[in-house]
């Protein structure tokens, strides 16, 4: 069984056509996940305008104990699902490489453009969603010094001189 988590109906239609050999289920919100029915599924997550990280959605996915998770994202988030095997792929992956990845064959899937820790991605998502510093500190339960350290590291990783350049960053749509 394949669970396709996306808000993009064209993406889902494409996945359904590619994965025609199996049972393909479209999931748009966490209430649609049935922990018993979808147990041990193969999960494919599209994060474009659908940032499911750091939400109850990801907790629900972890409870499913999926066989494998493929995440379409320019960000590689270290240990985002604990011990669940996760592969991050860009949306520009070829169909041949994607099918090889689904079948468990070796394929030369390019690495994600940016590699972040869970906490760095969480801080980056909060900044992209225009939360104030105080709200971020309260939500993430971190100190001001830790926040500035994460912010500085993120700016170095993304090659930003000022944090307000983030709104024009090529991957901003994957954070909201």
Swiss-Prot record:
Q: Which organism is it from?
A: Escherichia coli (strain K12)
UniProt keyword Nucleotidyltransferase, yes or no: no
- The reply to whether Repressor figures as a keyword in the UniProt entry is no
Which N-terminal residues, if any, form the signal peptide? Answer: none
What triggers production of this protein?
A: By acidic conditions. Could be induced by EvgA via the induction of YdeO.
**Residue ranges of domain HTH luxR-type in the record:** 109-174
Q: What is this protein called?
A: HTH-type transcriptional regulator DctR
The record's listing under Pfam families reads: GerE
Q: Which gene encodes it?
A: dctR
